[in-house]
Amino acid sequence: MTTQNFLAEIGTEELPPKALKKLATAFAENVEAELNQAGLSFDKVEWFAAPRRLAVKVLGLATAQPSKEVEKRGPAVSAAFDAEGKPTKAAEGWAKGCGITVEQAERIATDKGEWLVHRAVIEGQPTKNLLVGIISQALAKLPIPKTMRWGDKTEQFVRPVHTVTLLLGDELIEGEILGVASGTTVRGHRFLGEREFQISHADQYPALLKEKGSVVADFNERKALILAKAQEKATALGGVADIEEDLLDEVTSLVEYPNVLAAKFEERFLAVPAEALVYTMKGDQKYFPIYDKDGKLLPHFIFVSNINPEDPSKIIEGNEKVVRPRLTDAEFFFKTDLKQRLEDQLPRLETVLFQQQLGTLRDKTARIEQLAGEIAKQIGADETKAKRAGLLSKCDLMTNMVFEFTDTQGVMGMHYARHDGEDEEVAVALNEQYMPRFAGDELPKSLVASSVALADKFDTLTGIFGIGQAPKGSADPFALRRAALGALRIIVEKNLPLDLSDLVATSAKLFGDKLTNSNVVEEVVDFMLGRFRAWYQDEGIAVDVIQAVLARRPTRPADFDARVRAVSHFRTLDSAEALAAANKRVSNILAKVEGKISSEIDRTLLVEAEEKALAEQVITLQAELVPLFEKGEYQTALDRLAGLREVVDNFFDKVMVNAEDPKLRQNRQAILNNLRNLFLQVADISLLQ
């Protein structure tokens, strides 16, 4: 089979930088899927993405679909011919549909008799006839939330399309995609290299684009170049560049031919908290800040230009000029805010609604203050400090700095609290109350901060559920899913002795008569336990393990986690499958019992050796495992219970549970009931698959 390399490039106006990488990888994945669906073999699909183009290059693409043999079965021979041996109308209709006569059909013998059959070989189409459709479909399936039209065209895409290049080897694949006819014209950099040039072979891409058009089409190549040069520039300045992956991807998406440069700002701005300076450098300007070896911000930054003049001084000066007003604003806001104590902002919180039915931010801080104090008492934190941090928790939202630079909430509260002479634990808690801010983020370090973070999250969860506004579908305006998962992470990873039901009930009381949902405790707890499911699935823990623990509805997160870890370990044991099946069998047997099942095992009613053996082991384990259950040592307990496999198997092999004698039957049911209850102290093992 012959193969060729295939190139498809879509030349556009500037694509959304935050979406570029996602669009490019999705384009490649879609092309791969379409090729597979068409039955076209290939070696590899490479993707390229720059601000004004999306491209894929398919290596080793078969130049034609493989031929395939098809078999069309017709009517049974007995129904295909009449008594005189002439073809019936059914046979003739089938044959006509196949493009043959009845006489040309083959016959096959089956266990149900003899049938007419037509076998044919369908030749595969040339690949070049399929490529326009494949690329069109791949583009149509891109994850584009909002499309646009341009000119007088009816076609829609994320941005206007100007060129389409489709080359199978050196052959131009003619066709129209998104209203643009394919050709061999490729556009280069807006300001460097050739604006337009011709490409004659798929193999010339992307090298020719870099050589003639001054465009580095390979996203990962540009990204690596920016990273290396930024680190090199920072090192030369005696520091380390702060290069976050998301910002690096965004900057990579903004330039076609990256030119990495370093610039500076006045040292006086370093008197402003670094977080505010970094916020504007990263968020507004897409710059990379530089820190010294001790983690202190240096008065330098890295930026990436899309042009490469011999003398970059003008570009550097321009960027320094652009960032100066933003830093001046931050300096002004900071100095203005310092004229008031953080506590002086409390009255202003009364002017800002948290939620119409739940009151103002001042109401919320009062609740957080009380709840943080209660939590602090339970986890051994300083109650006074926790309450103080709770009281001040939202004051920085009223400051000029946070109003202008919203992402500095919390961290500016910390800086202002320090300036006011607040206790260090209180100040740090004002920042850490929002942790974890996203999946994988760090947790509050101190117990005081943990108390405030939990109080804030439980206040929001309880309040919003308490007025019947639980998240529906993907809508979650109060970020309740994130709040629930964050609270669970804090409790579990810090092994805090807290109960969800108690926390929600305590929180609910602080709302007075504002809540209208009488089931708020159960609903919030169920919601949070549901977030456990997502958390553990992300960790790769089997769904049946999570279901087994959820069936017991433990409401202490640290305890829930211990059970999940124990059951996950138990599931790997050789005896797990048999004991899970046995528990399922026990559940089915006991479910059919009418009336109450006794929990007392009468030794005088033990007849068979196998039931005696099981009963004795169950009775012994009941005494031995109680201390383990009380201490939450579930894995050790399940390891001990795993040793029951043989006696359980023997019991079911040799003992008739539903004996005719009612006393024997009830006693055997009691044995099984006690056996099941031992496992249920941890989880419902019968749910393991």
Swiss-Prot record:
Transmembrane spans: none
Places the protein is found: Cytoplasm
Entry-linked Pfam families: DALR_1, tRNA_synt_2f
EC number annotated for this UniProt entry: 6.1.1.14
Keywords: Aminoacyl-tRNA synthetase, ATP-binding, Cytoplasm, Ligase, Nucleotide-binding, Protein biosynthesis
Quaternary structure annotation from Swiss-Prot or TrEMBL: Tetramer of two alpha and two beta subunits.
UniProt protein name: Glycine--tRNA ligase beta subunit
Gene behind this protein: glyS
